[in-house]
């Protein structure tokens, strides 16, 4: 995943880029350790687009996967190696020369971390797909900015056998809500639900099944969501290429409604919201994502 950051005048020496792009990567063949790449993202720089530095983890070979979408205010980047159920934290006090400051594996039996997001208080909230074993339901874990465990909350619903694997995170500070999607990275089964949590207490408030559309299998595996400009409404897509709207989050019965079907293709991956526009990646018939809508 990618993080874009700006360097202040104090941070950036003369002739150094004013904007940087951090990219968390693994190599194509999974033969070398994951690494964080620093790229010149200053469009006015003569070296725009060039690689500035790379910082490997010097650890086991794995799968570099998610980071926060935006650089946290602490300047600490959480980055996960999903295959190894591991989290790395980079500090960016010197934006041009990040340093690996900490790493950890399982937390209180929670394993396979996926997404990270900065809460309004500066702490980091993360989805963990499982707890206690690969065929279990995970939950939310909250960390201090520097990676200390603070608290957690299970996604499993007592007495109900709903398949859940917490995946993406959307924060709605205006309404004191956290929304999580559910998609199993190990692909043991399909999920059809999103969950809504109280941001202050991490109490699980709602588990809502996506509405089924006749003749279209697009309600499988809620994937990534984005908060809209009103600060209250969420659009999210499914891995099976459906687009849905979630609103009335502060009501007793939040509402999910079908919006659009992107493609007949095998899957739809990460979206980007730019102002009032939704840009959606769509897979080719051969597997990789090679287009957008």
Spell out what each predicted region is.
Residues 15-17, 71-74, 118-121, 172-175, ...:
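Residue-level detector of Asp-centered blade-edge/turn motifs that repeat once per structural unit
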Residues 38-47, 89-98, 145-148, 196-205, ...:
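Short loop/turn segments immediately following beta-strands, especially the blade-tip
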Residues 47-57, 97-106, 150-157, 204-212, ...:
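Beta-propeller fold detector
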Residues 48-118:
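Blade-loop segments of beta-propeller domains
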Residues 61-69, 108-116, 162-170, 219-226, ...:
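Repeated scaffold domains used in trafficking and secretory/extracellular systems
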Residues 94-173, 182-184, 210:
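Asp-box/WD-like beta-propeller blade repeats and closely related beta-sheet repeat scaffolds
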Residues 172-293:
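Beta-propeller domains
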């Amino acid at each position: 995943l990618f993080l874009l950051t700006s360097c202040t005048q104090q941070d950036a020496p003369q002739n150094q880029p004013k904007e940087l792009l951090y990219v968390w990567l693994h190599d194509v063949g999974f033969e070398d350790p994951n690494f964080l790449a620093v790229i010149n993202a200053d469009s006015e720089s003569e070296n725009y687009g060039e690689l500035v530095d790379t910082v490997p983890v010097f650890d086991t070979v794995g799968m570099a996967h998610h980071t926060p979408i935006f650089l946290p205010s602490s300047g600490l980047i959480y980055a996960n190696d999903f295959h190894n159920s591991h989290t790395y934290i980079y500090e960016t006090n010197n934006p041009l020369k990040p340093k690996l400051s900490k790493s950890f594996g399982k937390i209180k039996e929670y394993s396979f971390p996926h997404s990270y997001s900065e809460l309004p208080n500066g702490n980091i909230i993360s989805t963990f797909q499982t707890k206690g074993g690969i065929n279990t339901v995970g939950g939310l874990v909250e960390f201090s900015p520097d990676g200390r465990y603070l608290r957690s909350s299970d996604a499993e619903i007592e007495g109900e056998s709903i398949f859940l694997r917490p995946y993406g995170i959307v924060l709605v500070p205006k309404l004191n809500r956290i929304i999580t999607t559910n998609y199993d990275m190990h692909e043991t089964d399909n999920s059809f639900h999103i969950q809504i949590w109280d941001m202050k207490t991490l109490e699980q408030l709602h588990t809502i099944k996506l509405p089924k559309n006749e003749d279209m299998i697009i309600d499988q595996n809620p994937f990534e969501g984005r908060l809209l400009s009103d600060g209250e409404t969420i659009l999210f897509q499914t891995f099976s290429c459906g687009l849905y709207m979630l609103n009335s989050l502060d009501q007793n019965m939040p509402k999910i409604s079908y919006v659009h079907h992107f493609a007949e293709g095998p899957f739809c991956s990460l979206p980007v919201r730019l102002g009032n526009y939704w840009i959606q990646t769509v897979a080719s018939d051969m597997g990789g994502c090679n287009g957008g809508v």
